[in-house]
């Protein structure tokens, strides 16, 4: 089940006519890591960072370290990883989402 943040992202992405993304995409077989949203053919990923103002797992010691390890592994495998917070989607969704679309477009000449 998608979080409120994931649902908000998906709604905004559709409104801006973004290409299809795969939710909860498993990119690392050994570690079973998943990316919140992925465009696998271009290796573009979106990670949504919830709980940043409520001392959520992503901003506490081990959780932050684990996320860094995951993002570094994705980057080493060629992924462009975009990290977004709820306020980034609220305050300037067009700028933040079109930046992701621009990289997808750059990596995939067949898309628009």
For each feature predicted by the language model, list its residue ranges.
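Nucleic-acid endo/exonuclease domains
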Residues: 1-112
